[in-house]
Amino acid sequence: MARGPHDASPPGSTERHARRRGRRARRVAAAAVVTLAALVAGAGAGNGAVRPAATPTCHSAWTLAGRGAALHDALAARRDVLGERLLAMRRGPTYAAARRLLPPLWYAVGHGGRPLTLSGAYYLPFAYPFTVYGPQAFALHVADGSEIRTRRADGPGLTVFVGDGRERYGSCLARLRPPRLARGWLPVLRTGYADARGARYAQESFAGRIPGIRSLVSFVRLRVDAAHARGAAVVRFVASPGFGARLLADAAGERDGRGVVYRIRGTAVIHVAWVHARANADIVPDGAVYDAARGAVSRLWDNALARGTTFEVPEQRVVDAERSLLVQQRSLAWRYSVGNPYEELSFAEALDAARVTAAYGHADVSEAILRLAVRRLPARYTNWRAGAVLVAAADLFRLTRDRALVDRVTPALTTVLRRLEHQLRGAGPGLLDREPFSSDVTRPVIGLHGQATVWQGLLAMARVWSRLDDPRLAARATWAAERLERALRQAARASTRRLADGSLFVPAALGDRARPYAALTASRDGSYWNLVMPYVLASGLFDPDGPTARGIWRYMGAHGSRLLGLVRARAGRLYGRGPSAASGVDQVYGVNVARFLADADLPDQLVLSLYGMLAGAMTRDTFVSGEAATVAPLRAARLGSMYLPPNSGTSTAFLETLRLALVHERRGPRGAPSGLDLAFSTPRAWLREGATIRVTGASTSFGPVSYVLSRRGDIVRVGLDAPPVPTLRLRLRLPAGMHVRRVTMSGRAVAFDAASGTIRFPPGARGTLELVVGIGP
């Protein structure tokens, strides 16, 4: 995929593991072929052998029937025909409509198309973090309930067998109840399964701690009902060779080599634990131990999320996704992924995560990411990375007002500024030097995306240094930004081509005479253009309401940039070198699309992206994503595949999209904050009868903002706690057919735009404000 600039793998992912990973990957691939073949043939797999299934097929119940042609047509089209279908609905885009169009994501694919797990299913990364600094332990719980792995997908682990003791739990998708999270978002995995003999199982698992054991511990509770099965249920928990001592079981289990066996007639509840590091443990993980550990996990995450901003909307799936993704972001921190070769610092993506977690009130995570990026930048320097660091540092100060953080990173940022000044003072036109297009494309270019990011970062840090009474650094950064801006605008104008449809094509590599792409995903270069151009649009270099930005956006919309509101990509690492129509999505790069959509006030497109992500960019009910995802399933599979999940980038994109729908800062021509727009891009159903939207403590450049919108009948009541802000606006996006009719504040009329539902607060409005809004047909 595009991969923004990224750093080398962290400790624990070093070259000494490479040969072992290669051998393990070959074994995993071979085993997965057996498993997938069993699924296609209508059988479950257990202990390497194909077991007869009680049902004629073990495929997922989801089918392409009636959808295959529509998906093919959508992939071949240059417009977002699926998105346009949802936008044309009277209610606008909804999750229910979006989920019917795309297959659920299920399979985790690595390099060379190899599955990451034995069953091919994705895994969830569970952690019990004590600090966002330094290495962390991770437990990888496979989504079908079949396995738990230690730290890496090829690490030691625990496998669950049921039925006659040889049927892998979850191996028949037709008999697997889809995975969910406890309370909708907690890192506690729940699945259900029926084996080939008719016994039924309900499994819950999570990662936590046991007093006296320093290691992270995974806990499993398995409820078994074999009362109506054809014979006893034989449940086996089997550890990897040489790791049997890490498996702890309750008193009912019988040791059997490196595993534990239960033979059940009737019903039973089983408790086992998997210790992820060597430890002297003689604890029996009974129900009391399990409940205590689970309670601690619940309290940990309740407390962690309570410290940040809360966005409460009248759509539980969106709230669950928000909370689950915040858990993931706090756990992964700077990591692009966990448990696979993508566990690394990827600069642009990690720094986007830092900006978004700061906006959600989790500044400890944001600071950890920024400080690591600053520390690693000298050895991995590119101008794009430097620009991303400048933008993130300025954003963190803007949202937290943490002067101490700026003081800590200013020496490193001064070195960056000196390096940029040296390039800009050269004999050239005022552009920065050529550098690799991205970490995946090493061709040296004058990258508009990287240089626009530097321009944005220089101006942002100039404002920070000015506010902190450092006029010398502020003046130097301003000079560098202005010189770069003049050269960038001139180079962009010289490279721009106007197409017959009135749209504009601006190449990402300036001066290289790139021609417009008829279909962006038909070529590697076009696909990469589509992934990096959002950095330009989000930087503010081009006025989001101006002809250049709108012309580029029109070009993107007519040449295959989006599908169901998601960023399209060639996805060659998933599909291989197939036909151009076999493209996927790469929503990691949707974060900057969302920023542009908010700046350009395109609310319906932002809503489309929100639901597109829930339906097609992450797993349903568990909210795991990869760097890229298929649209049409691979080969004989009915379900979608992801590349090297989990991935923090798509999580960042969803959280930013949700935040921008509810709280958006307007910016001036040079990026300085100029006003607040509240609830400007919400789904219209969020103001249906009886609905309430609540935002608490959202960080902004002007200070925290909180508000409540509550509709009862033909009245919407607004309660707002606003900081001092130059201009303050609120929008009520009502269901189709309803309009704002009158607005009063303390008995006085307030100006509003009936067409858009936008309310303009009087100049100087601040503090506690209350509105009464009358609505009607």
Short names for language-model regions:
Residues 22-49:
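Secretory targeting and sorting signals
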Residues 166-167, 462-468, 476-561, 636-770, ...:
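Carbohydrate-active enzyme catalytic cores, enriched for enzymes
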Residues 346-367, 371-379, 386, 407, ...:
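Active-site core of glycosidic bond-cleaving carbohydrate-active enzymes
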Residues 377-380, 400, 424, 465, ...:
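Alpha-helical junction/boundary sensor with strong preference for TPR arrays
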Residues 258-290, 380-384, 418-486, 513-525:
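The feature captures the catalytic groove of carbohydrate-active enzymes
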Residues 50-313, 317-320, 362, 670-777:
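Terminal accessory carbohydrate-recognition/targeting modules of carbohydrate-active enzymes
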Residues 303-326, 347-348, 384, 388-391, ...:
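Active-site acid/base region of carbohydrate-active enzymes
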Residues 1-24:
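Terminal targeting segments of Actinobacterial cell-envelope proteins
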